[in-house]
Amino acid sequence: MQQSSVEFTEYQSNELGNEPENDLWNLRDLNATRICISLVCSIIIVSEHCPVHMPILRSLLIALSRNSSLRRFAESSTLGGRMSSRFVAGTSVEEVLKAAASVNRQGISTSLDSLGENVHSPQEAQQAAGVYHRLLDAIQQRQLDANVSVKLTQMGMDLDPELAYAMAASLVEHAVAANTFVRIDMEGSDYTQATIDMVSKLNALNANRGHVGVVIQAYLYRSKADIDRLLAEGIRIRLCKGAYQEPASLAFPEKADVDRNFVRLMQTLLPSGIYHGIATHDEKMIEATRRFVKERGIAPDQFEFQMLYGVRRDLQKTLVADGYRVRVYIPFGTEWYPYFMRRLAERPANRIFIARNFFRQ
């Protein structure tokens, strides 16, 4: 397949305050942002010893993930880069390819994600697709054990669903030629139905079957019905808990209910004979999965556990040593802030790690 002509251009950002006409505003904004980050990190550290209501802290972090001033400071500063480096494999294609090769050497598969969402023009969508075409070429040329994960809003879904479909279809076609796979990421609940419909349309082409899949979030009430539909169409699924802020009318508000639904959905997926991914760092969910496949006689190579880059590396290695397949989701790029904040929101250990390191020189 011919590589997209759209070249990947790394965004070269400057520290806030470099534009003379905005010096005063930027200085105030920068100082306020630093104070805000320091305050959040302090709250996280204190909460480790004197627990606060976790849903409140989670909601705060998700709200901050949408704060433009914090995002601008974080993505353009050395401090932000240092904070994100645990979970984000650099900003360039070459950096993420090196990270993927390193993970592969440990016997672990990878899924590569060029960070970004909600593009504002068809040109931005084409540029984002161009990055993925470069990744697919490199995966084939370097014989990496890797696939790619793509958000439809990055392909132009907000602008024109037909544009997003065209961009995604070109990537799946390329993945077929490269003998790999495209995972369509799930975003907020506003996009759930459109995402499932588009994956169904992509999978309906005979040549694409087995080369495109989707993500289902266990915290949504609708997920069992969605899984039943997708299984009937033979579509591969990544099951995760979900990391976006959703109302109680759409999603289970309590972790215990999310966990119960996760186990229920896992038990629906794994006997289907389709290769699925169980995406969790929760040892209780992992142990429930291990017990279930043992009871049902499901071989360890009939599914995979999936985890995030930089999270529970010890557990990744343990699962591989025990004979299970593991895939690590590796994000990269300059637009890392929303992803990073959602990772802090969903897992206390991530928050504590970052908060402690924020105050270290």
PLM feature spans:
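Cationic, low-complexity basic patches in intrinsically disordered or flexible, solvent-exposed regions
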Residues: 3-4, 8-16, 20, 49
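Enrichment for repetitive, rod-forming helical segments
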Residues: 9-10, 19, 35, 350, ...
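Helicase P-loop NTPase motor core of nucleic-acid translocases
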Residues: 43-45
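Positively charged, amphipathic and often flexible ligand-engagement surfaces
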Residues: 50-361
